[in-house]
Structures are given as C-alpha cells and as structure tokens.
UniProtKB/Swiss-Prot annotation:
This is Putative POM121-like protein 1-like. Coiled coil: none annotated. Pfam families: POM121. It is a single-pass membrane protein. The lineage of its organism: Eukaryota, Metazoa, Chordata, Craniata, Vertebrata. Residues 54-65, 77-89, 103-114, 219-228, 376-385, 417-430, 490-499, 556-579, 650-676, 689-702, 762-771, 828-849 have a biased composition (Polar residues). Residues 1-177, 211-252, 266-302, 315-348, 362-469, 484-522, 536-612, 642-741, 753-793, 812-856 are annotated as: Disordered. It comes from Homo sapiens (Human).
Length: 897
C-alpha cells in the first residue's frame, strides 16, 4: 500500500473532476499518462497483458465510481479507466435500471467523490442512494437544459460483445468511447422553480377571471379587506356601470361577513353633504402600508367612481355640488372624479373616519390635512363678500368696516390680489404643513380662537378641537395679527420678528392713510409687541430734513432674544417715527416757532408732542421701533442713531431761532430758585411741558435708579453741585448727601453739561455709543450758537474720550454754518471699554463734558510706545535665558561624559 501511494498512477483530470480509485494488490495499470507535468491529459494504453485476477469487490467499486463520473464529464475524450476496469457482469442490467431517472444521481457526486478516497464503500452506498432517489418522487422529473431527459432509446446502442475476455492471459480489447452525460447546473434548478411558479400562476389564473375589467373598483374593496384582516377569498368590486353589472355574473361574492357593508355601499347617496368634495386621502393611505392577506387583489387607485350606482352619474354629482356653492365659480373648483383615491375607504368612512387599525397620530394628521383642503376649497369658491363677513366668534370691534375695506381694495388695485394668490396656493401647500393653512385662511377672521375653542367653518357646522387638532394650533399662532385680506400692518412683521414666532408669513406693509384711520387700533393681541404694533400702525410722515424713516433692517430678528430691560434701553430720539399721521412736519415746525417767548397760541399746544412720548420712562413707545436692545449690532445702532441725531439737531437748531434761554449762570445758582424756573416756563410755553413731566415723575423714579433722576431734574441748574454738597429742590428744604446718595452721584455726572432745558448738542449720540451704556434714555437737546459760546470748555473728566470730545465740539456749530452734523463713522462702537460712571449717564449728550482736556493723543501714543519697549525688553530677557540654559546643559553634558 505505501508503494502504491507513491506511485503516480492515480491521476485526476481537472476538466471533468474524475478520480481514479486505488488498485490493491500487485496489479499493474495498463495505462500511463501522456504528460508528466500534471496537466489535463487522457490515459493511453500500455502494451502488455492486463492482470484480470482482481478481486470482485474492487472491480465493482471501480465500476461504480467511474460510471458516476462518466455521466458528468463534458469532454469528448474517451474514459479509458472505466472502459478497461469495468466488468461485463451486470452491466446491461445496470443500464436498464438506471434509465432516464439516473440523472438524479449526479446530485450526490460531490459527496461520493470525497468519500471514495477514504472509504470505497461509501461510493457504492452513495450510488445506491442515487438509484433509489430516482423512485422517491414519482411523477416529478427535473427539466434539463435541453428540455427533456435523455432516454435509453435516444442513445446509440452499446455493442453486446463482451469487452473483457472471459479467459485469462488474453489481451484487453478497448471498448468504443462512452456517450457522455450532462451536468445539473443552476439553470436547471431555476427552470424547476419557474415550472413551480407557472403551476401556481395557473392556479391563480382562475381567480383572475373574477376581475371583469380594468376600471376602478369601489373603495369598499379596501374597506372589506381591512375589516376582515385575513379573508380567505378576495372581495370583488361591484357595479361599475349599469351594463357591466348586467353582464357580470352575480355569483362572484364569497365573503358573507361583508354583506351589510356591500349593501350599504350599494345604496346611492343623493348628494354630497354640504357640497363637500371628496377629500384626497393625504398620507394616511399609501402603498407602503402593509396590507392583509388579500392585498394583492388591490385595484387601481382611481376607484371611487365605481362606488356610485349607474343612475348617479358624475355630472349629477357635480351639479349637486354646484348647487351647494355660493357662486358659479365653484364648478371649476371641483376635481374630476377620476382623481379620487379609492384607498380612502368607502362612503361609510371615507371622509374622516379611516380604519381603526391605523395609528392615532397618523389619523389625526391626515384628518387635519383633509380639513385644511376642504376648508380652503370652500373659502376659494365663496368669493362673494368672503373678506367682508367676519366670524361671530372673533372680536368684531377689532376689524375695519366693510366700506373702508372696499375703498382700500379699489385704491390698491392689483395689489389686492394677495388673497387670491394665497387661496390658489393653499390647496397645494396645505399638504406640507400647518403654515400653509395661514395663507389659505387669510380672508377669514380668526382672532380670539383659542386652542380649546371650536372653529365654525363656512359649511355651518362647527368642528370640535378633537377633529381639528393641528388647524386650531396653527390658527392660534396667526389669529393675533391677521384680521383681513388686506396686506397686514408692519406691526405684524415687527411682532413676528420680536417674539421669534413666525406663525404666518408676513404680508406687505403700510396701507394708505385713510384706510389706517378707519381701522381700529385695538387689533393687536401680542402683549410683548403691542407698542410696536401701535407705533408701526401710525406711519411717520417724514422728518423735517426729508429723510424717510429707516426700515428695521437687521435690528429685528427672531433669533435675537429680548432682554428684560429692553423696554427702557432706547433712545428718546425715536420720537420722530412715532408722530401721528395728523401731526405733520409743517405743523410741528410752526408749533415750535410759536412756542417761543411772547407767544401762547392754542395751536402750539396741539402741535406739541404728547407727554407720554417724551417721557423716557414711559415704556416701549420710545424704544421699541428704532433703538433696539443693547445686544444688537453696534454698527447698525450707530448708523441709525447718527441719522436721527442729525435730523433732530438740524430741525431744532433751525426752528429755535428765538433765544429761549439767553441768560446763562456761570455760578450754578441763578436757575435754582423757583422764580427763575417759572420765568423760563412762561417763556417756553407749552413746549416746556417736558420739564414738568420729568419733575412730576422724578420723585417716584429717583428711588429706582439715578438715570430717571437725572432726566427728572433736568430743568434745575445743578452745575457745581459737588457730591458732598446739598441740593435745594423746589420744595425749599435741603436734602443731605446721606438721604440722596445716588441722586448726587448721578447729578455730579450731569451738572457739567446741563445748564438749561434747551436741547443739547448731537454729540450725545456719539458719546452714548462710545460709552456703550444705556442706563436711561437720553432726552435730546439742541443749543444755539450763542449758548455754545457761553458754555465753559473745562467740563471734561473722562480722559479716554479726548479725541472724541474734540471732534464733537467742532461739529456742534454746524447748523449755523449750514453744514450738517457728520455721522460718527466707525469710531464709536459698543465694543469700546466702558468707564466706571457709564451707568449714571442719564443724558447721552452729557458725555462731552466728561472728557479731560490734558489727555492728548500724543500722551496716549507715548504710553503705547512705552508698552512696546517693555515688551521688547521682556523678549530679550527670555532669549538670554534660553541661550544660557542651552549652554548650561551643554556644559553639564560634557562634564558628565
């Protein structure tokens, strides 16, 4: 056996994967390979007699194994081993037994090959298993590639002469080459699967006869399949048309459980209730939802038409829907019946119900969207007086009259088509989100509709909050600002930007003047931005200098949080934009000219600004529109304040030509008496009411902060009042420093610049930007030329702002020379360091007096140069230490080694 293992007589051909079994005993092989390189080669016979005295069992094993491999060979070369070692006994009987069914033995070839090398008995057992496998599945045959297995009659007959001689010692006669078989490939298995599928399809072909035509079936098909869940037979659609019903056999219905549903669906509905169109199902019913066992019988999606009996045609249904409209234009709004979806259910549950097995969240969302679509369609078709009739549930007093609205629509012309555009786009956009509902419902009054209330639609029947959860939540955000079909006021945009809630898209702004006068001023319900809305409601006619009121721009954004003190951090320079419409620029100039000494015309009192708009502590009317919180960008704030400062300074310096407060008091005591103050009030007339209001509020506000105190005591002369001295108020009794610690500290900052009640220079805007402190809203002043000449120039105490002060002092005489006050430019920003007394700067115009004169730019440059020298010295010292440490380490390393 070991010698035979080393003998390379046993070879394997890679082409047909044939293995030559081992030969036991001393028998020699009659063949040798044509090449010795191990490549694929046939065996050729060796000269000499063949030893035929082999064991019968070995001969049988060799025959069984070679007969298996010969059938799977694809080459045309002859198999010499099987022909030479096969015995004549039992060969015809084996061929007859194998027959056509022997092709199934090829499946176990891989197993028999591997086992045959170790145990030759496994080959015979595997071959026996293959022979028995041909009879295991009667009636089933494997379809080969050619289409049918080869039978014995199709092969050429083998010779009946025995191949091997019966006597020993005679030479072996080689038989003719055997006819090779074929392999079972993946294509054969695929054909077998296709055959099985065809058999199944042929069985299902009987069921396909139940479908009469390609027209849509009723939605009750989906309802029945959903109701049963796992029905044995598919529900069949009923009654698409009259003639089709007559031709169709009536014995197709096999679901007895759905008989009541089918009978209910057969009953024709006389007309759609309240003229509603069939809702599109939205995302509730989609093809991605899992269907029951009978889901493969689903028909086309446009199957709703077949639910209506033949006598109830689409034309009659459209006519009924047109009768329920309020205008003939409703006929065009009805979609064609073929676009309706069958998956929305039958007439029993098509509108709002939906199957019970769907999720509640999806059902609520789908209902909300369907309600939006129907609601938009009704509002689209009801064009007659749709924007005039107001909902009874909303506040009717907060809306403008219908006559004013019609007049506005006639004046506005093509711009009034905004409602139509919103309605036309609401049908498509409403599928995306609740925001689109706001555009569709713009013509309806929804003010005051809380989430817990009910909304009365146009159809007349109220829908509860449970049936419209998303619509009411979306409308509640919007009903605070939108009240009619006209473009909403600028307060809508301001409020949405200030609060950060953009419930509805902002609409175009600024309707005409008379339309605004007709509109009540109580329409705004957003508490935080109510002053904003009322301020933006009144259009500013234009400042005297001809400049338009600037748009909010980037100052108002929904991403900026509003600080808690934002209502008191504005500049009183914003009064220009808050002038009512009837208060024109001409009347204001006339009033300012008539209120000078010697005049007390009644028109001046009417033309004067309202006291509430002048008081810095009055709230958001002074600081809501233009100032912006302190955290807004400094560049935008500086530009806005500079423009307003120029406008006010130019107009006040031009109109205040009469020397209202000519007398100056350098000793700071002339204006402290009550007589001088009364004389000043008599000269200034009604325009001096600002000082009175400030005084009346100073007693209460002075306890809250020094900012209000400074504005309250503005008409008193406080120059020269040191922190340690006492201040004599109007009451006549002195107040000590201990009783008024914060007041004196605030007045000490203020008394260097304020000497009368006239408007101060426009440098207050520059200084307030430089200090960055908005402690109290400064009140604008405007001194004249002679007053500026009389003012001493030694009032400075903030060293850092010396260059700023010099620039502001030069530009203060600009109105006399006809030049406008220059804008501050980028010199002043909120990022500059704040001085210690910045919180006490009640009037931003007073910061000019806080600049010390001795501190020049040259001294500041010298300090910068000293800093550079110190830095260079430190760098040199660090470099020296680094070099020294390097040499020290080098020396230590040299000594250590």
């Amino acid at each position: 056996m070991p010698e035979q293992d080393k003998d390379p007589r046993v070879q394997e051909n890679p082409d047909d994967q044939r293995t030559v079994p081992e030969v036991t005993g001393d028998a020699r092989s009659a063949f040798w390979p044509l090449r010795d390189n191990g490549g694929p080669s046939p065996f050729v016979p060796r000269p000499g007699p063949l030893q035929t005295d082999l064991h019968a069992q070995s001969s049988e094993i060799r025959y069984n194994h070679t007969s298996q491999t010969s059938w799977t060979s694809s080459s045309t070369k002859r198999n010499a081993i099987s022909s030479s070692y096969s015995s004549t006994g039992g060969l015809p009987g084996l061929k007859q037994r194998r027959g056509p069914a022997s092709s199934r033995c090829q499946l176990t070839l891989s197993y028999s090959k591997t086992v045959s090398e170790d145990r030759p008995q496994a080959v015979s057992s595997g071959h026996t298993r293959c022979e028995k496998g041909a009879d295991t599945a009667p009636g089933q045959t494997i379809a080969p590639t050619g289409g049918s297995p080869r039978s014995q009659d199709s092969r050429p007959r083998r010779r009946k002469i025995p191949l091997l001689p019966r006597r020993r010692g005679e030479p072996l006669m080689l038989p003719p080459p055997l006819e090779l078989g074929y392999r079972v490939t993946a294509e054969d298995l695929h054909l077998e699967k296709e055959t099985a599928f065809q058999r199944i399809n042929s069985a299902l072909h009987v069921e396909d006869k139940a479908i009469p035509d390609c027209r849509p079936s009723r939605p009750s098909h989906t309802l029945s399949s959903l109701a049963t869940g796992a029905s044995g037979g598919p529900p069949v659609s009923k009654a698409p048309t009259m003639d089709a019903q007559q031709d169709r056999p009536k014995s197709q219905d096999s679901l007895g459980l759905l008989a009541p549903l089918a009978s209910a669906a057969e009953v024709p509905s006389t007309a759609p209730v309240s003229g509603k169109k069939h809702r599109p199902p939205g995302p509730l019913f989609s093809s991605s939802d899992p269907l029951p066992a009978t889901s493969y019988h689903s028909r086309d999606t446009a199957q709703v038409t077949s639910l209506i009996p033949a006598t109830f045609t689409a034309a009659s249904r459209d006519a009924g829907m047109r009768r329920t409209r309020s205008a003939p234009a409703a006929a065009t709004a009805a979609p064609p019946p073929s676009t309706l979806n069958n998956t929305s259910g039958s007439l029993l549950n098509a509108v709002d119900g939906g199957p019970s097995h769907f999720l509640a969240s999806a059902t609520a969302a789908a209902r909300a969207q369907r309600s939006e679509v129907r609601y938009n369609q009704r509002s689209q078709t009801s064009r007659t007086r749709s924007c005039l009739k107001r909902n009874a549930s909303s506040s009717s007093s907060s809306h403008s009259s219908t006559e004013g609205l019609q007049e506005l629509k006639r004046r506005r012309g093509p711009a009034s088509s905004h409602c139509q555009l919103a309605h036309s786009s609401s049908n498509t956009v409403s599928e995306d989100g609740p925001q689109a509902v706001s555009s569709g419902h713009r013509c309806e009054n929804k003010a005051g509709t809380a989430p817990g209330q009910t909304l009365a639609p146009r159809g007349g029947s109220p829908r509860s909050q449970a049936s419209r959860p998303h619509i009411n939540s979306a409308l509640y955000v919007e009903d605070k600002a939108i009240s009619d079909c006209r473009p909403s006021r600028p307060s809508h945009t301001l409020s949405s930007l200030a609060t950060g809630a953009s419930g509805g898209p902002p609409v175009s702004k600024a309707p005409t003047m008379d339309a605004q006068q007709d509109r009540p001023k109580s329409q705004d319900c957003l508490g935080l931005v109510a002053p904003l809305a009322s301020a933006a409601e009144v259009p500013s006619t234009a400042p005297v200098s001809g400049k338009k009121h600037r748009p909010p721009g980037p100052l108002f954004s929904s991403s900026d949080p509003l600080p808690a003190t934002s209502s008191h951090s504005r500049d009183s320079a914003q009064v220009t934009s808050l002038i009512p419409a009837t208060f024109t620029a001409a009347s204001r100039d006339a009033g300012m000219r008539r209120t000078r000494p010697g005049t007390s015309a009644p028109a001046a009192a009417a033309a004067a600004l309202p006291p509430s708009t002048l008081n810095p502590t009055s709230g958001s009317l002074l600081n809501a529109v233009d100032g912006g919180p302190s955290h807004f960008l400094a560049s935008a704030t500086a530009a806005a304040r500079a423009q307003r400062s120029e406008v006010r300074y130019n107009q006040r310096s031009q109109t205040s030509r009469t020397r209202s407060c000519l007398k100056r008091n350098a000793s700071s005591s002339s204006h402290s008496s009550t007589e001088g103050l009364q004389e000043l009030k008599r000269r200034r007339g009604p325009a001096s009411s600002h000082c009175q209001l400030a005084h009346s509020s100073s007693n209460t506000v002075s306890e809250d902060g020094p900012q209000a105190v400074s504005s309250g005591h503005r008409c008193e002369n406080k120059a020269g009042t040191a922190p340690g001295q006492t201040l004599a108020p109007r009451g006549g009794y002195p107040r000590s420093q201990a009783s008024r610690p914060r007041i004196n500290s605030a007045l000490h900052v203020e008394d260097k610049a304020i000497s009368d009640c006239r408007p101060s220079r426009p440098s207050h805007t520059l200084s307030s930007l430089a200090t960055g402190a908005s402690g109290g809203p400064p009140v604008s002043k405007a001194p004249t030329m002679d007053a500026q000449q009389d003012r001493p120039k030694s009032q400075d105490c903030l060293g850092l702002l010396a260059p700023l002060a010099s620039a502001a002092e030069v530009s203060s005489t600009a109105p006399v020379s006809g030049k406008k006050h220059r804008p501050p430019g980028p010199l002043f920003s909120s990022s500059d360091p704040l001085p210690a007394t910045s919180s006490h700067s009640g009037d931003s115009a007073q910061d000019t007096s806080l600049i010390p004169a001795p501190f020049t730019p040259a001294s500041r440059d010298a300090g910068i140069r000293r800093m550079f020298r110190v830095r260079n010295c430190l760098r040199g010292l660090g470099l020296f230490l680094l070099v020294f440490s390097f040499f020290f380490l080098l020396t230590w390393a040299s000594f250590s080694f």
